[in-house]
Regions:
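Accessible peptide chain termini
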Residues: 1-3, 34
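Long, low-complexity intrinsically disordered regions
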Residues: 22-253
Length: 253
């Protein structure tokens, strides 16, 4: 009998918690004036308005592109095989047509930043992560990109000499840290083509530096790094009024 009661209580608590998360997610969307998104044009407009948007889970319930898009735009696996994920396919057009910045900026996870907010974000992050040391692997990666212009990840990895076993994840770690430092961004996504001339697969990130993609002036900011960070945090509280200081700072740091 006691075990049945414990199971029932546990199940009820789980249901309450799930409803709480759903309520918070809806509140984040409603209080931020964020309507459900059905296409890339709407998502471009939303990023223009709110400035920052992680692609997937941000640690703030309801605040990600995956949370905001309509159900038929999310990841689905078909019973007969194959998959579809409209949101994933929009990333390239959001960068190239919406001119938003994309990379692993939020606690090592991918997301979008509007060009309006990029100077403040870049100002804060580059102060926190100074230029790589001379002779370091990070410097070699940036010099290779400066020389080549833009490269998909596997090409960049090969040119930097990371060709041995277990080198892929190690190299990806360096690239992620450089994205967190706003030294590398994604220019577009490149997809393999099948024999029917159709794109397929997850695609490869075409990496470059923000200076090459947007010009050096795009990074300039007339505030101190501390002022930029305070400005971003204050703005995020208007976008996500139900988020705590700790949640926002964890996402941004």
């Amino acid at each position: 009998m006691n075990s049945v009661l414990r199971y029932s209580r546990s199940k009820n608590l789980k249901l309450i918690w799930n409803f709480t998360l759903l309520f918070v997610s809806l509140q984040v969307i409603n209080d931020s004036n964020m309507e459900e998104v059905h296409n890339s044009a709407q998502l471009i407009e939303l990023i223009d308005r709110i400035g920052f948007l992680p692609l997937l889970d941000s640690g703030i319930h309801g605040f990600s592109a995956e949370d905001i898009v309509a159900a038929d735009c999310r990841y689905v696996v078909f019973p007969e095989g194959g998959w579809d994920w409209p949101l994933w396919k929009w990333k390239g057009s959001i960068i190239t047509e919406g001119h938003h910045v994309y990379g692993k900026f939020f606690a090592g996870k991918a997301g979008f930043i509007s060009r309006e907010w990029w100077p403040d974000f870049c100002n804060y992050r580059r102060n926190k992560h100074p230029e790589p040391d001379e002779g370091s692997i990070e410097e070699a990666i940036l010099l290779t990109l400066a020389e080549q212009g833009s490269l998909i990840t596997r090409e960049l990895r090969a040119l930097c000499g990371f060709t041995g076993p277990k080198m892929r994840s190690k190299f990806d770690g360096y690239v992620t840290r450089l994205q967190m430092a706003t030294r590398i961004v994604t220019e577009d996504f490149v997809y393999p083509i099948d024999r029917h001339n159709n794109e397929y697969g997850w695609g490869w990130s075409l990496l470059t530096t923000p200076e090459q993609l947007y010009g050096r002036d795009a990074n300039l900011c007339n505030r101190t790094p501390e002022e930029s960070f305070a400005r971003i945090c204050a703005h995020m509280h208007t976008v996500c009024p139900y988020a705590t200081d700790a949640q926002i700072q964890k996402m941004l740091r």
